[in-house]
Amino acid sequence: MPRSSPRAWIAAAVFLGGCTAQPVIVDRPEGESRARLDESMASNVRSLGANGDWLVIRGYHATDNLVATLTNKPFSHAAVLDLDRDRVIEAESPGVHETPLAKFVAKAHRLMLVRPVWAGKGNAAAALEKARQLVGRPYDFLGLIGLDVPDRYYCSELTLEIYRPFLRPGDLVPRPVDPGQLHYWGRVLYDSGAR
């Protein structure tokens, strides 16, 4: 019986693994159907969401592809909903900033609306106010690898930081937290589903 070489086993594993792996890179579709989808997602967020909720997305940018690959999760970015202003507050490489809701939704391949477990009893209003105060702060590049730099924020760090005063004694929130983990600390109100 002939012996198989290690190369043959590796080639077989790669071939078979490729059959089960989901695509990591997603491209933004164009056209009228995409515009209808964007409007549907935004409408669901407006009707089901509240100030201080989290929007967790799978985006189309190269960094979204990188985050999805490294975390092996279907989500790559997160933001805080400011429903009163029809905006989100998000942390990206330029820093913490506001983005119109429609523009944020347009960069989403998939969108999940999450109500944080700490959002009750007026906490969401205080959390949103904290997020508004953090606009202009720099991005926390080192936080992505677990090295926290005070007064700098990456996307999911921002979403959790604004609720930090309301964490309960038993709430164990690891650092770093990737966007694909946020639903563990909330209730999913809407999920657009994968395309």
Residue map of PLM features:
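Cysteine-nucleophile amide-bond enzymes
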Residues: 19-195
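Sec-dependent bacterial lipoprotein signal peptides
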Residues: 1-17
